[in-house]
Amino acid sequence: ALRIRWQAAQQARLAEHLGQELTEMEWLSRSARQLPQHDLAREKIIIRQQMEQLQTELAGYGQLSRGLAHYALGRGHMALHEYPPALTELQQAIQLEVQGAEVHYALGFVLGKHFEQAMYEARLSGGGDWARKQLKDIEPKYLTPAIASLARSRSMRLDAPQYLEGLIAYYQRDYDVALKQADAALRLAPIDQHGDCIGE
């Protein structure tokens, strides 16, 4: 019982530290993207260095931190808008039983970005019937799990919970609700949760 309590306390401290580091990475990414258009290479290098440092730190905790390390890397890739590696890392975190609203929010967000990219590519490749067939293939792979993960993240504390509701409505193709929620989110928190507007 003592060992289990010690592990739980260690994991809680680790998660708190991780949260602070992730907030710093995401703030840097968001701030850089809000500046006048410029080369983001410098900021990307800083974020990658932070990711490497975090990975090294987490490795020192051994088995206890494996899932958290994947989660941290997933969020780092997410901050860099590198969605394929973000998806891989977040899925590995969940397989290692890292749960919680924040993990599901990140996974849902990234799956949604994959869906948008796949739709864009389907339209470029032919449109019409071919794009509709592609949609049937990619919906269960990306869209359905994106909506499910976002819905599981509703307990997460956000500055503007309407952003999450708008994102879910957008992926459910309820565009009127999505726009209303996006408008409400912008009034509450002028800068949204990830520097992305619904539908971008």
State where each predicted segment sits:
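Charged/polar helix/coil "stalk" or linker segments at domain boundaries
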Residues: A1-I147, S155-Q162
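C-terminal luminal/periplasmic domains and tails of membrane-associated envelope-modifying transferases
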Residues: W130-G199
